[in-house]
Amino acid sequence: VYDIETVSLRYFNVYGERQNIAGAYALVMGIFAHQRLNGEPMTIRGNGEQKRDFTYVGDVVNANILASQSKNVGRGEVINIGNGDNRSINQIADMIGGEKKYVDPVVEPMETLADNSLAKELLGWEPTQKIEDWVPTYKKEIGL
């Protein structure tokens, strides 16, 4: 409208160093870690088979840098920034380890999965970190 170049990056469940472990903006991994550190079972809503695409914060940073420098974007594109694979909430709980407590479900999508082909095509971006490779380091850092 005003000759302003824009691009929107759509992030999928960003995790990484310094993530919130409590409060309204904490993600499931942080919530589980907080519960474990407090000697509580990990609370899973529903059956835990909901799947999410988890994306490492360093990969998100890289996508932002590439988008800011790319000559291939700026016409209002919406680009998914996600790993392109997903894990169930039960799988995340198993990675953290510990007792699980299943409670009533909430209304939410059963699955999110990023189609990151546009990020690859326009930005040359690909994820570098898988959640299952990062969790052991995270557990050591927080003392689990």
Positions of the model-derived regions?
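Active-site loop immediately N-terminal to the catalytic Tyr-X3-Lys motif
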Residues: I21-A22, V73
